[in-house]
Design a protein with these regions (language model features):
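Active-site regions of metal-assisted phosphoester/phosphodiester hydrolases
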Residues: 1-108
Length: 108
């Protein structure tokens, strides 16, 4: 869950997370509430750091009338992944819709 109010804080949080996994020799999947829309600086920076967006354009917020996408699953390395299926599940257990994805990774 990245910061809800401050974009600079979200950018720093995303940088910390992506730096943490940068040297991993294993495939990595991260996900959650990034509190940022697809064209935001923070999402563009994540993509520029070679993460792959493993979700479709499903709108996830607010759960009762989804209007924006701010929840994501990202995978690294950027290549070799395939989405078998993904969906936002309609539920009011949270203010966000959960995303369920089945991914396949083929090591190159």
């Amino acid at each position: 869950h990245l910061d809800v109010t401050d974009e600079k804080t979200r950018e720093l949080q995303a940088q910390y997370i992506t730096d943490y996994f940068k040297t991993s020799s294993y495939p990595v999947i991260i996900g959650g509430d990034f509190n940022a829309e697809p064209n935001s600086k923070v999402i563009k920076k994540i993509m520029a750091r070679h993460w792959w967006d493993a979700t479709d354009s499903a709108l996830t917020f607010p759960a009762w009338e989804p209007k924006v996408k701010i929840d994501y699953l990202y995978a690294r390395p950027q290549k070799g992944w395939r989405v078998v299926r993904t969906q936002a599940v309609h539920s009011l257990l949270s203010d966000h819709l959960p995303i369920i994805s089945e991914l396949e990774y083929v090591r190159e």
